């Protein structure tokens, strides 16, 4: 059962990372293609010159940026929960592979202006520290 859990945790983290990476990148890229930031026509409203296209684009980017922030926070929450569960169950995750997948996701997000790699560093530092502490405590109990 435990071996199955280890494989399942690794497969879940890897697959959810890949799904988020592909879908978020595609959606943001397509959204920006549909609503490009092009300054074209300006009009005069009262005594103030306003660029309606620019105002609309600012609104559109607020929408996509809010959605992007929501999705990234959701992904980071899922990642933290699964890493915490692997500590709780004393799982042996192939950490280098998990980190590679997650940082590749971060690299993809940096291409659309949402670099999450600094948050990933904090998450994995916390995970490694907790995992190390658990292993030290376990060894102390075993040999004390």
What are these regions (language model features)?
Residues 1-144:
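Long alpha-helical rod scaffolds of large eukaryotic non-enzymatic complex subunits
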